[in-house]
Amino acid sequence: MANSSRSRAILSVNLDAVMANDPLRELFEACKTGEIAKVKKLITPQTVNARDTAGRKSTPLHFAAGYGRREVVEFLLNSGASIQACDEGGLHPLHNCCSFGHAEVVRLLLKAGASPNTTDNWNYTPLHEAASKGKVDVCLALLQHGANHTIRNSEQKTPLELADEATRPVLTGEYRKDELLEAARSGAEDRLLALLTPLNVNCHASDGRRSTPLHLAAGYNRIGIVEILLANGADVHAKDKGGLVPLHNACSYGHFDVTKLLIQAGANVNANDLWAFTPLHEAASKSRVEVCSLLLSRGADPTLLNCHSKSAIDAAPTRELRERIAFEYKGHCLLDACRKCDVSRAKKLVCAEIVNFVHPYTGDTPLHLAVVSPDGKRKQLMELLTRKGSLLNEKNKAFLTPLHLAAELLHYDAMEVLLKQGAKVNALDSLGQTPLHRCARDEQAVRLLLSYAADTNIVSLEGLTAAQLASDSVLKLLKNPPDSETHLLEAAKAGDLDTVRRIVLNNPISVNCRDLDGRHSTPLHFAAGFNRVPVVQFLLEHGAEVYAADKGGLVPLHNACSYGHYEVTELLVKHGANVNVSDLWKFTPLHEAAAKGKYDICKLLLKHGADPMKKNRDGATPADLVKESDHDVAELLRGPSALLDAAKKGNLARVQRLVTPESINCRDAQGRNSTPLHLAAGYNNFECAEYLLENGADVNAQDKGGLIPLHNASSYGHLDIAALLIKHKTVVNATDKWGFTPLHEAAQKGRTQLCSLLLAHGADAYMKNQEGQTPIELATADDVKCLLQDAMATSLSQQALSASTQSLTSSSPAPDATAAAAPGTSSSSSSAILSPTTETVLLPTGASMILSVPVPLPLSSSTRISPAQGAEANGAEGSSSDDLLPDADTITNVSGFLSSQQLHHLIELFEREQITLDILAEMGHDDLKQVGVSAYGFRHKILKGIAQLRSTTGIGNNVNLCTLLVDLLPDDKEFVAVEEEMQATIREHRDNGQAGGYFTRYNIIRVQKVQNRKLWERYAHRRQEIAEENFLQSNERMLFHGSPFINAIVQRGFDERHAYIGGMFGAGIYFAEHSSKSNQYVYGIGGGIGCPSHKDKSCYVCPRQLLLCRVALGKSFLQYSAMKMAHAPPGHHSVVGRPSAGGLHFAEYVVYRGEQSYPEYLITYQIVKPDDSSSGTEDTR
């Protein structure tokens, strides 16, 4: 718009040009300059809205706002200044302060009621003004107070079209977007409120997942931020790059309150992302239990499938959560069916498990929702629910029972169903009101409640009785209730203890009144039949006749037993009821309970002397009346044989039901006279045995042959059962009629673990049976014999061992200082680094090899290694005399060393990091990489050079305390031998390469000899101890070991304290004679997660490392199945797990002390793809 068409010179009038005699000039000047004292002095009700007639007809507020005088603006507003006053151009005070960027004044005016969308004569809004003048803060304030950014001025321009470069991002929603997103993520409410507008509330991040502020706030549980965003129009349906809505984020991280806020704001609980994951998938897979419950209560469907055809139930990681989700889903489906009164759907859903499902947030049960349904099928639905066991008196969160709701809504059919089923007629809600209070205005409802003994005298918390709320016609009814005896019978039926108490105490004779219009039942008949326990107890205590029979000859005990009311039955029997009383048809209470399948009642009656053989008029015993489906009742009536059968079959539930103090030690009279514990022990039914022992079973009971339960467990090798029996003080040396102890049984049957257990708990290995045989004479298995031999060691063998030890000590040779160096090393290298002693060791394949003792010796100041020798010792493959070698005589610092290696460009870096020669001597590849030497070639060159320098000068050398790794050349005999052992011990494993990868050969990259004096001396000492304890035989072998903690082992040795008790043979250190088996553990148990770089268990790129170790096995305990141990068995130094059907495929060697093994070689290798193997390579799997 051209300036000629509209003058935008706001406040351009020079007040100095106004006539000197203008009486308002001083006021306008004071407002302009912000002189608050002068303004207060000059302002009056007449001048507060005065006009500048010499200018644009502005008011004092125009001037103060335009010049940003906040105090003056505030005073003028408090003094009655018009906030909507217009000057001659239609400008309001808000236009002025917006145009000049006075953000504080803008907020003050908006707070005082100024319209953010007011327009001037050219249809300019304050936002047009602020946008065109580049006033960012003002634009933010206006948008935050509802400014409409789509309004067009008289030239059809929006604020965005007029926006300055600075304000354009505000109007596009891009202004400081990253800060806004970060504020939402971090929960910075003040910063968020300062930046938030309707235009950026749903902005998406420019990178990453393209999340909105609501995504971030929901994911990081910023409840306050979420509330602010939702209040400002945040879209709960916005999706990020992966199709996730904010509800996905909140549910995934288990943020319950945020989830609730989003759902209340209209979030779709079944929203799908790009992979068809719903919020419930996220919550279930992360075990967010409370969030799952919330989603299900709002209609989430756990049966929806994601792209992997998995439902939310499938995604739950635990069985408990899967069952809970399925249970709650069924419960909410039933609640929905009841809410809609869908009887056919409810029939399909209802079952005893969910009929009393409670809505987690309203407390409503299916019966509550059925009662309030307006549908005509309400009664049919309620009857269905009550038949299935719906609780009649459950209260919801408002403390209302179903009867309160039915009375409130005057649903007579619902009231009748509830009352007939025994709902509490005088239940109180949170206001102390009964159902009678709720329907006091309606005569039919009141009459119905009074027929069930509703109490008209109950006063609510508001001090009102039902009569005070009743209409005139109802009031008469309430003042003349039915007679007291009828009332008593109805109260006993309904379980109204207060009414029963009041009537009986006022008229004690009425306690045995009769229902003359019915079956001549007494109040006790009704109370017993309807399971009114407190009423039964009260009536019995006040003279009710327990023998009173109705006109069919039924006593109250018949009623209680027929309907399965256990507590009532117990009370009646306790008060003298005859358990064998008969009605007119000769039915006893046991007949009634058996015919109705009431197991607990039958058990109670039998306990108190009920006769299971008594016949009714048709000649039927209680057992004859049992239904085919009631197996438990039939078993109970069978007697001890059922308990013995349950113990034998391991049916714990049956055992629990059938056991009584009288039957727990019953006998199998038709068999070996066994007890239930004999059978449970012999058939390895641990849970049954444990239950029997905890409930008083005789642990030392003998059967017909004199066997106790421990004999059975030992004979059949049931280790856990035997341990349980020993825990319960069984006699471990008990004998049967033939003098056999449990140890005889276990030894004869080759039960190694049981023999060990029995011996550990005092079993006597010398006891003889009637034929004079000890357990060892009956033993068939070698390992059992070894175990018993150890336990029966004589004093003679101890003396022989002592003599052998002395002989070994006196005859041990002194180290030969002139022995040959290790094969493959030069004599000068050997003399400088290795002890000259050599030993013969047994390799994994069974071959033997002569090795030098791997102990580094301190270097003398005169010791020197030639460059060629140094290169060889450090594994400088392919080195030559042309390689750069540091001159030890001229190198005194790092700069000189780097110069000798032609690495001048690294001098500044090393000086900045203050790296000395001593420090450099201790550094490795990773350390150099961290300080900035990223090129592998440079690092290799440095490490090679420093190794040579250390060899010739001793710089940084501490071989006595630290581990030294000596590289072996590929043509070295030791290198060749190790490689041959690696390749020759590859085997095919049962997991088909899942743990260690699929391969048929290795690529051996490097073999390093481990030298550590401290570790070697510790190993040598332990090896000597083992030899002395094992007839001078340490049984040393070379075995493989794979572990993700190779470096720690090389530096500090093996440590049994870190062994895992969950291993097959307990908390030991495991070795293998096959390299492929150890390869399975290089990245952890079962291959862990694979190599660090590619997370691939079968990675053919990344180098791996394992150890070839010396292991002093000593005397090994042979084991064929898993057994958890914390140390080697007594008299043994190791455990050897032997292959067996259903057990190990290849042998394992386990020691339980770290000093029993020494890491001899560190092997770096790669597994090779089978396709990459040369055609001539032999398949050694």
From Swiss-Prot:
It holds the Pfam family Ank_2. Zn(2+) binds at C1091, H1094, C1099, C1102. Residues 807-834, 864-886 are annotated as: Disordered. It catalyses: NAD(+) + (ADP-D-ribosyl)n-acceptor = nicotinamide + (ADP-D-ribosyl)n+1-acceptor + H(+); L-aspartyl-[protein] + NAD(+) = 4-O-(ADP-D-ribosyl)-L-aspartyl-[protein] + nicotinamide; L-glutamyl-[protein] + NAD(+) = 5-O-(ADP-D-ribosyl)-L-glutamyl-[protein] + nicotinamide. GO terms for cellular component: cytoplasm; cytosol; nucleus. The keyword Disulfide bond does not apply. InterPro entries: Ankyrin_rpt (IPR002110), Ankyrin_rpt-contain_sf (IPR036770), Poly(ADP-ribose)pol_cat_dom (IPR012317), SAM (IPR001660), SAM/pointed_sf (IPR013761). It is an enzyme of class 2 (transferase). Its EC number is 2.4.2.30, 2.4.2.-. Interacts (via ANK repeats) with PI31. PANTHER family: ANKYRIN REPEAT DOMAIN-CONTAINING PROTEIN 39, ANKYRIN REPEAT DOMAIN-CONTAINING PROTEIN 39-RELATED. This is Poly [ADP-ribose] polymerase tankyrase. The gene is Tnks.
